[in-house]
Amino acid sequence: MSALLEVRGLVKHFGGLNAVDGVDLDVNEGEILSVIGPNGAGKTTLFNMVTGLYVADGGSIHFDGHDLVGLQPHHICTLGIARTFQTVRLFPAMTVLENTMVGQHCRTRSGVFGAVLRLPRTRAEERRVLEQSRLALSFFGSRLAGYRENQPAFALSYANRRRLEIARAMATNAKLILLDEPTAGMNPRETQEMTELIGKLRDERGFTIVVIEHDMRLVKGVSDRVVALDYGRKIADGTYDEVANDERVVEAYLGKRAAEEAAG
């Protein structure tokens, strides 16, 4: 497998805090990579730099041959990276289908002029957006497709809102999807379903996936490889068993837990 995403020496400071401190990371094409670590380890900050929400203070990010540092989020989206967030970010009053279509804004080129005049190019683009959105929703079966596509997002269960965020990312026609804590707030049954779904995203739809997750059952169930961060630094990189048994990873988790218990 070739590296689709290459991160070298990545740095991000917030005041005197080194949120990400010299991280190297490769994501291979067709791989499911999990990024783990205690709260505050720099996981989401890493995602934010890859997707252009934060500008790196040092280091490099290359995706599919493109230098991402300094690019705007919409430009990075057009190159083939999509993401979800820790907290659900949908348009509650818009329908399931409309929320999915919104995800393709970075790939649409028809402006107001074309929309008003209903130019052929605009109509063709609208058909493409609609077809791509319904294809993404169909992956989730009756949970999002069929009659549900016309329901407002606020009417969905929490788990289905999470699924809708993933559908929106899929509809961008991305090569790489970044999932930030996709099972946060889910019960064990929903977590197991999400574990299976992430595997199918790669196996059936061909996405390369990086997932930030605290639930080790999901991490063990889906990961080809696991990277552990602590205090902004990479402390382990390998298979699930290799990382889970790494003394530095055990210390990072147990050390944080002991400190929390002492404070409580």
Locate predicted features.
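Glycine-rich phosphate-binding loops of nucleotide-dependent enzymes
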Residues: 2-264
